[in-house]
């Protein structure tokens, strides 16, 4: 299950979790993942594919959740964010999961070079102290909502930990989309549906408060147009 190039737009904000699919989609899937986790590797293709199944209706965000039991996971998370700063997160994501034996510092740099990244910039970026704060923030959401293992998924706030099958994952997203469409039919604005559903799914007030601050109230710039399509609102000099 590989994504179809250009069918789903990728986000461009280097300071937010990388995403596939439009901001304001009625279903938001947050993937809480660890690059050294073997089960996360099995789920990685599904992460890429699910927005392709429901284009325009589903947004996937990749949140870092490196587990302490995996010694190379945090370094890989930092490296992936450094690749994101050069607009290559998803390519780098694919390479890290393709070969989990190359997650040591030298292997991470070698992967960056193979993808054509500016390695000097990559090394500076992955050493930036603010990356740890971001990773800790993303992991805090996982821990607070009960995702102590990986992979974990928040489908409009509803938590599922572990990986069963592609059909099970797709079915869960499809069922949530049905519920989201019911809200839209009642007049709830399309871009408010994911938050409304998450608030209903997250019962603990403290957990909802953290989710709201990190996810709902965080700036959500629109995704870039799919490959081959130009955004008429932006000039060629826009970011």
Feature locations, PLM:
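C-terminal cap of thioredoxin/glutaredoxin-like
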Residues: 49, 110-239
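Short active-site neighborhood of thiol/selenol oxidoreductases, capturing the structured segment around
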Residues: 23-37, 60
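Typically the conserved alpha-helix immediately C-terminal to a functionally engaged Cys/Sec
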Residues: 33, 39-54
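A short beta-strand-turn-helix
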Residues: 10-27, 52
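Extracytoplasmic
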Residues: 24-26, 55-57, 63, 148-150
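Short coil-to-helix leader/linker segments, especially the first N-terminal amphipathic alpha-helix
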Residues: 1-13
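Solvent-exposed loop/turn segments at secondary-structure junctions
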Residues: 35-38, 66-70, 98-102, 128-131, ...
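Structural microenvironment flanking redox-active thiols in thiol-disulfide oxidoreductases
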Residues: 51-112
């Amino acid at each position: 299950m590989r994504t179809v190039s250009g069918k789903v737009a990728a986000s461009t904000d280097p300071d937010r979790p990388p995403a596939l699919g439009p901001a304001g989609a009625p279903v938001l899937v947050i993937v809480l993942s660890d690059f050294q986790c073997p089960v996360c590797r099995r789920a990685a293709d599904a992460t890429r594919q699910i927005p392709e199944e429901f284009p325009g209706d589903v947004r996937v965000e990749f949140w870092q959740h490196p587990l302490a039991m995996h010694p190379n996971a945090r370094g890989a998370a930092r490296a992936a964010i450094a690749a994101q700063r050069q607009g290559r997160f998803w390519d780098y994501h694919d390479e890290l999961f393709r070969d989990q034996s190359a997650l040591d510092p030298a292997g991470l740099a070698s992967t960056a070079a193979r993808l054509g990244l500016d390695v000097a910039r990559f090394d500076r970026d992955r050493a930036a102290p603010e990356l740890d704060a971001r990773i800790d923030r993303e992991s805090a959401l996982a821990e607070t909502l009960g995702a102590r293992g990986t992979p974990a998924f928040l489908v409009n706030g509803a938590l599922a930990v572990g990986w069963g099958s592609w059909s099970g994952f797709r079915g869960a997203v499809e069922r949530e989309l049905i519920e989201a469409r019911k809200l839209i039919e009642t007049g709830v604005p399309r871009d408010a549906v994911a938050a409304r559903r998450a608030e209903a799914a997250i019962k603990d007030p403290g957990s909802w408060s953290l989710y709201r601050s990190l996810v709902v109230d965080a700036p959500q710039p629109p995704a870039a147009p799919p490959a081959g399509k130009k955004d008429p609102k932006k000039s060629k000099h826009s970011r």
